[in-house]
């Protein structure tokens, strides 16, 4: 399978959108393109599983590799490939692009321009996950960031210009750290290439990058990617950005874009600078991620805006991804990838339902919402399912991911790590506080105004989006083994290098 198809199809969608003359044609292009991408992602999963059976059990295959020299003086290649981690992230991206298209169709003005930038954002995300050349990854990373300013600043709500600028400046600051770290690895590895696997192979032994050098570039890369993963104290852009973003952008941003942070930390920072993961910096980041988990959950408790509640919840759950990576156990790392997949699905469901309620009610304030289960039962069930998954209720995706993380975390017998794990576990109780408060208040308490009684339940477009995400959240919770197996196949050999 040629992985370039995941870039080519969105490019064709851009062309189709550019030529579209009315909203009907825009809808046709988006539905067709998103459906093709989802179908290709499902096919990729099955093709990967089939190809994986022919590989040795102790190897993490980078399958469907493709390399074309791009800028030879600097040895930059257009290099593509996927392992189990990439495959599940590509599937997650396609699910959210597909459901996001349906979820936001009734809401957004200037649909042609909106979906042009939305599709460009998806190109950056797809390209990042299929790239195995650091420079190509960075290029697609930047492509994913650029549309965010316009999507929030033009189509957002509230303090949208402030939120868009704050998000852009913070993430561009992270990009500056990333390019320094990437160039540092390129020059000090001696491999004369940006390709991740070639660098890892070259530096595994006598040509290892000196530990003192690794300790310089590791924090730059971890913080650079960690900013996108809402690492404390660099998380402040995230709640404002989520709250102001339009529905589909919130879904893709929280569901997928933030996962680029954890993916980059594991794939580049930890994999290529393994000596630095055993020193001072990993303990610093363990403390910061523990703070992220607890601080995000506590902050969600004091919010009244549904989007801010979910945004701070995302800070907590994405902090759990980085926390698991810092635990330095294979089980916890596998849990981190599962958490990326699980959180992506359930937070997309949250933002989809919240956006649909806000579109009609004109408010996201918990204090002015109530009795929605009687008025809009379908959307209310969607919100309840997202809340239960967020709680980690057995049978939903959140339970599988969080249990894997905490079991893996307790495998580290060091007292410092045990204390951090116990503190992080308190977030489970705090999460129950704000989730149950919201579910009880907005779904079952008295309807506060006659305006809410005029709300209508989801349209067919919205039902497709919500039902699809509910099925994915429940499906991953009930049948997690397929994802867990291909993730462990990829995590194991990477950890053999790190440890």
Residue spans of the language-model regions?
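Hydrophobic transmembrane alpha-helices and their helix-loop junctions in integral membrane proteins
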Residues: 99-105, 123-135, 149-441
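Select subsegments of transmembrane alpha-helices in polytopic membrane proteins
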Residues: 2-3, 252-259, 462-466
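Transmembrane helix-loop-helix hairpins at membrane boundaries of multipass inner-membrane proteins
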Residues: 1-2, 17-102, 106-116, 192-193, ...
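Alpha-helical transmembrane segments and their helix-start/interface "positive-inside/aromatic belt" motifs
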Residues: 23-35, 162-174, 376-381, 459-468
């Amino acid at each position: 399978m040629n992985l370039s198809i995941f870039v080519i199809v969105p490019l064709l969608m851009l062309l189709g959108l550019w030529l579209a003359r009315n909203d009907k044609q825009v809808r046709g292009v988006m539905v067709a393109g998103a459906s093709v991408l989802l179908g290709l992602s499902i096919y990729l999963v099955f093709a990967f599983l089939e190809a994986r059976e022919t590989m040795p059990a102790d190897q993490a295959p980078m399958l469907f590799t493709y390399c074309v020299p791009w800028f030879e003086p600097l040895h930059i290649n257009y290099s593509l490939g996927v392992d189990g981690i990439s495959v599940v992230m590509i599937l997650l991206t396609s699910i959210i692009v597909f459901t996001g298209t349906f979820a936001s169709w009734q809401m957004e003005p200037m649909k042609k321009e909106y979906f042009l930038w939305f599709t460009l954002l998806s190109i950056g995300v797809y390209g990042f996950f299929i790239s195995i050349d650091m420079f190509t990854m960075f290029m697609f990373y930047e492509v994913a960031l650029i549309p965010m300013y316009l999507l929030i600043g033009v189509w957002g709500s509230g303090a949208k210009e402030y939120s868009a600028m704050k998000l852009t400046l913070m993430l561009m600051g992270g990009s500056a750290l990333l390019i320094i770290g990437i160039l540092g690895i390129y020059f000090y590895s001696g491999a004369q290439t940006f390709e991740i696997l070639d660098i890892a192979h070259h530096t595994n032994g006598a040509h290892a990058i000196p530990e003192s050098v690794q300790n310089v570039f590791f924090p730059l890369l971890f913080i650079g990617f960690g900013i996108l993963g809402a690492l404390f104290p660099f998380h402040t852009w995230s709640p404002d950005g989520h709250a102001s973003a339009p529905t589909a952008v919130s879904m893709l941003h929280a569901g997928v874009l933030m996962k680029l942070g954890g993916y980059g930390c594991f794939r580049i920072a930890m994999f290529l600078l393994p000596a630095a993961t055993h020193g001072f910096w990993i303990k610093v980041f363990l403390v910061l991620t523990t703070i992220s988990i607890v601080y995000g959950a506590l902050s969600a408790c004091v919010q009244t805006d549904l989007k801010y509640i979910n945004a701070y919840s995302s800070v907590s759950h994405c902090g759990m991804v980085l926390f698991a990576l810092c635990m330095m156990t294979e089980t916890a790392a596998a849990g981190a990838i599962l958490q990326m997949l699980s959180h992506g699905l359930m937070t997309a469901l949250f933002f989809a339902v919240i956006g649909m309620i806000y579109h009609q009610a004109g408010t996201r304030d918990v204090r002015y919402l109530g009795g929605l289960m009687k008025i809009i039962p379908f959307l209310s069930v969607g919100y309840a399912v997202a809340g239960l998954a967020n709680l980690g209720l057995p049978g939903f995706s959140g339970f599988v991911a969080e249990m894997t993380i905490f079991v893996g975390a307790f495998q580290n017998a060091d007292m410092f790590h045990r204390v951090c794990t116990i503190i992080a576990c308190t977030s489970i109780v705090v999460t129950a506080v704000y989730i149950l408060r919201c579910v009880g208040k907005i779904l079952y308490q008295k309807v506060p105004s006659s305006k809410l009684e005029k709300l209508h339940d989801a349209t067919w477009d919205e039902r497709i989006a919500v039902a699809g995400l509910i099925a994915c959240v429940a499906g991953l919770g009930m049948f997690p083994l397929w994802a867990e197996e291909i993730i462990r196949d990829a995590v194991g050999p990477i950890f053999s290098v790190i440890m």
